[in-house]
């Protein structure tokens, strides 16, 4: 799948009619530069109705779809999220709020590869949202399971504690919406930079644009204005 096409899959999910969003934001920035050596992430966030725990679980269940196949409706619970997110990054943190509850899940290829998992293991958490911006832990109810899941977050996510996880949750302003953070972005196959490392598929160096790597080089080589250089879509 073409990388910008994968990003479009995630945008389609956020703009889906049952999502109910009026605004979808796409961003790219460096995660914890002092901790993660300047690794970029891509975020997709909407102000829709959000998901409850069951719907979040269904979204992450490969092959699951509970949607009516309406014309023009790609489907939040179809294959779009899995194919789009895993095409762009090894890891995805999904955070969502709905009906007074907050939920998150980590879909991590890095974790699965590290433990040699045969099954797709996905740590999930739920909190009850209380007055004053406080969160009350809800699920998992078993303390051992909670600690085990949090250890996965601490080892394989850019958030290294429950506090940092909830700080990320607070980026969803208000009582509903969904935020997807893609990190450990995939790199170009068979191509490396001067230090022998593979390059990212995206170029984040041009203002607020997210471009395919190569668009900027094309502009410089042809001496053309940025208005006419890119042959591919540019998200702003």
Model-derived features with residue positions:
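Amphipathic alpha-helical transducer elements in NTP-driven molecular machines
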Residues: 4-8, 53, 74, 78, ...
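Alpha-helical hydrophobic packing sites
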Residues: 15, 48, 80-82
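Conserved ATP-binding N-box helix of the HATPase_c
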Residues: 1-32, 84
